[in-house]
Amino acid sequence: MVEEIKNFKIETAHNHINLYQQCGRLELLSNDNELQSLIDLEKPHKLGLRNLEHLMSVLLFIPRPDRILMLGTAAGSLLHFLRHYYPQSEITAVDIDVELVEKMLQIEVLPPVGNGLTYVYDDAAHFISASTQCYDLVLVDVFSGAQSPAWLLEKSCTNGLYQILGEHGAVAFNLLIDSEHKFKLFYRDLRLVFQRQTLCLPVKGLENTIAFGIRHPLTARDMAWYMDHAMEMSEQLEIDFLQILSVIYNTNPVGAGVI
């Protein structure tokens, strides 16, 4: 990653982005000044936003993923994280905004193509419906303005995501939904499609909601096992998974699905 990046704006047909570098960090803000992504320029693999740390807690519930699909790239903090901690995994990053991705690659903010990483320029909904591949982990980080797009909340999309998961795969959603009713409908459909193998969790201090759908029923584990597993994963990935696990248990009823 380049050491010096001047502050500038990127305007495309899909995004109006402000990029600022300060205090060794790169901040990506929307046109209305909302923080969308944050990268530590010295340690780009270290996640700087709480919602992304919560999103990656899906790793507590699945085997090590060999094939990863990421829908939406933003400034690439998740891609840097995945490339650093899962160097042997094949990662496909899908984004509709060719101009933005090419610019971010040019200034070396996004990790380059190669070593298992591929960029695909496509609409995420189309990619899901047309995919013939199966993935161990699908990360959904797609927005329309400051909200999750309507198509993403439809049951047909949830069905499509279920179909492209491998036997022990999972999908993790980073959601911004301004209506509790809309979220309840989405989560009801998620639980139906994934046969109750789901989790959801709020992100303290942020409006994001994280939701997981896991394709295959997990082996029954008690809280003590998950606490030990969370401590082990915390050391490996530099994320406080114990704190996030506490949120998961406080939000989701035990015996009603995954936990």
Positions of the model-derived regions?
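A short, flexible beta-alpha/helix-coil linker loop
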Residues: E34-S37, F143-A146, V171
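Short glycine-/acidic-enriched loop or helix-start segments at secondary-structure transitions
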Residues: H80, P149, K182-F183, D222
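The AdoMet/dcAdoMet-binding core of the Class I SAM-like
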Residues: K46-E167, L206
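C-terminal substrate-binding/active-site "lid" region of AdoMet-derived donor-dependent transferases
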Residues: K155-A220
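SAM/dcSAM-binding transferase cores
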Residues: V2-E27, L35-E42, L59, T209-I259
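A generic structural signal for alpha->beta connector loops
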Residues: Q88, G114-G116, H168, Q195-Q197, ...
